[in-house]
Amino acid sequence: MKYDRILIRYGEMTTKGRNRNLFVRRLKDNVAKKLHAFQNIKIEYMRDRMYILLNGEPHEPIIDKLKNVFGIHSFSLAMKCHNELNEIKETALAAVKQLPHEGKTFKISARRVDKQFPYGSSELNYEIGAHILRNTDGLTVNVHDPDIDVRVEVRQEGTYITCHDIPGPGGLPVGSSGKAMLMLSGGIDSPVAGYLAMKRGLEIEAVHFFSPPFTSDRAKQKVIDLVKKLTTYGGKIKLHIVPFTEVQQAIYTQVPNEYSLISTRRAMLKITDALRQRHRALAIVTGESLGQVASQTLESMFVINDVTTTPILRPLVSMDKIEIIDIAKKIDTHDISILPYEDCCTIFTPRSPKTKPKKEKVVHYESFVDLQPLIEKAIANTETMVIDEHSATEDEFEQLF
């Protein structure tokens, strides 16, 4: 007898009341997309549980993929049997024997959801525990802190038995909270912001500003690689690459140096907002952390935000750099982000940017340069690509040279 299914437990979705089914269906769709290569599996879902029937598929690679699906609180390999005491005892014994159990401790945690079943939880704990003790060597009982917690759940459709919980990433299913545009540079912060936005259920489309010849194709490939890492958590992601050279040059030549950074950020936000409208998103996500750099002071954010009424979401706003780096390492974007390729955020950087800019001044300076035609041209010439887990990486890119 082998584990024949994976039991998935929901997290925050259980608080959603009448809307819960919408979240559960979204999670089911996301799990199905993630596991599309495993053609024999079948997914069954209920209001409070989801099951993946393995049907002979190997569980190890499936478990690895489930660890990155937002909306999953935890999951376990499971066995299902009929609601008959002897069969439950034998199935529980088989589940324990498939684990390293020599010298370990265990307990039984029985739960009788089906109240028609003739044995209560305490009786089940005793009967199953005694059966396991009689038929194993080197296994002892510890009801307070066991090495193995054998969970037995008797439901109307059958009894489910699990022995080990694997933590999921938590959060909400990607797409359950709507869609937002992620302003994605080549740095450390914005990929982390994208990851955290997806954890809150947002589907994201990435927007990157590309300024050739000042930025190279390697910088562009670096951003593609970052998006590819994010597809581990959100599936396919659209990447919009905006040609930004003419806009940046116009700002650099016409706007005073100390205000050029603020004006550049305002232009970026205008373009992102236009793309948001075109692609029917409801918010913009940035990697800003309050006070980290000159453009991320509260005064700067206020002036930059003035160009739109669209909600700006800043998942990193209260984090320090060490916290952000820790997450970047966890999601495997850090080493890509620190590759030494210039992006549009690092070129034309003023020596002494204003940390407390005045809105009236930046509006006055921008009145001397007509940026709107350049912004519209950049939007019209934006390149859009769809990135998935199979897109070419930097290593494959290097083989072209």
UniProtKB/Swiss-Prot annotation:
Principal location class: cytoplasm
E.C. number: 2.8.1.4
Enzyme class: transferase
Protein name from the UniProt record: Probable tRNA sulfurtransferase
InterPro entries in UniProt: Rossmann-like_a/b/a_fold (IPR014729), ThiI_AANH (IPR020536), ThiI_fer (IPR054173), ThiI_N (IPR049961), THUMP_dom (IPR004114), THUMP_ThiI (IPR049962), tRNA_STrfase (IPR003720), tRNA_sulfurtransferase_ThiI (IPR050102)
One of the Pfam families matching this protein, by short name: THUMP
Matching Gene3D superfamilies: 3.30.2130.30, HUPs (3.40.50.620)
Subcellular location: Cytoplasm
Known catalytic reactions: [ThiI sulfur-carrier protein]-S-sulfanyl-L-cysteine + a uridine in tRNA + 2 reduced [2Fe-2S]-[ferredoxin] + ATP + H(+) = [ThiI sulfur-carrier protein]-L-cysteine + a 4-thiouridine in tRNA + 2 oxidized [2Fe-2S]-[ferredoxin] + AMP + diphosphate; [ThiS sulfur-carrier protein]-C-terminal Gly-Gly-AMP + S-sulfanyl-L-cysteinyl-[cysteine desulfurase] + AH2 = [ThiS sulfur-carrier protein]-C-terminal-Gly-aminoethanethioate + L-cysteinyl-[cysteine desulfurase] + A + AMP + 2 H(+)
Protein source organism: Geobacillus sp. (strain WCH70)
